[in-house]
């Protein structure tokens, strides 16, 4: 890993929950250029926060913190399975016409406190904005036009078409992970490398 770098804390989404919806998304979208940035279902996750690291020591520090907080985090979730739905779309960017990210929106949002405990220990990048849990569908950094990455794209057609679309129902969130930024693998079947994770529910 090169330094400085970024890691991220996330709730991974198992690909079987969302792969059929993403196949439909690809088949029914009408913009080949935009869809060139599609990375596949294996990258699906809910981002909680970004973790800057300058060296191996920083990486070990954030991994140890996650492991040390395992009991506290698991206790806060209780003994029931943690499930969410993904419905509709939204964007990050200056405007819908200048979107950098198109994402599916989780119906249940209850993880702001996770961002707080990591921020309090100076592990996250400073960000005063409230947590926006999201599952990225398209990101401008992966979309190319005439061999060059685009800066933004028009998300309006996607939000009109998939604004009420149910991407996945009863997704079980079973672990919390620290991952490397920068998906790897073949186009359409990319994934993020996991550095550390803790289970959110212990099976008897």
From Swiss-Prot:
Q: Which GO terms describe its biological process?
A: DNA alkylation repair; ribosome disassembly
Indicate yes or no for the key word Cytoplasm.
yes
Look up the domain of life of the source: Eukaryota
Q: What InterPro entries does the record tag this protein with?
A: AKAP7-like_phosphoesterase, ASCC1
Q: List the disulfide bonds.
A: none
- Which subcellular locations apply to this protein? Cytoplasm; Nucleus
Q: Which GO CC annotations does the UniProt entry carry?
A: cytoplasm; cytosol; nucleus
**What Pfam families does its record include?**
AKAP7_NLS (PF10469)
Sorted UniProt keywords? Cytoplasm, Nucleus
Which PANTHER family does the entry link to? Answer: ACTIVATING SIGNAL COINTEGRATOR 1 COMPLEX SUBUNIT 1
Q: What is this protein called?
A: Uncharacterized protein C15D4.13c
Q: What is the lineage of its organism?
A: Eukaryota, Fungi, Dikarya, Ascomycota, Taphrinomycotina
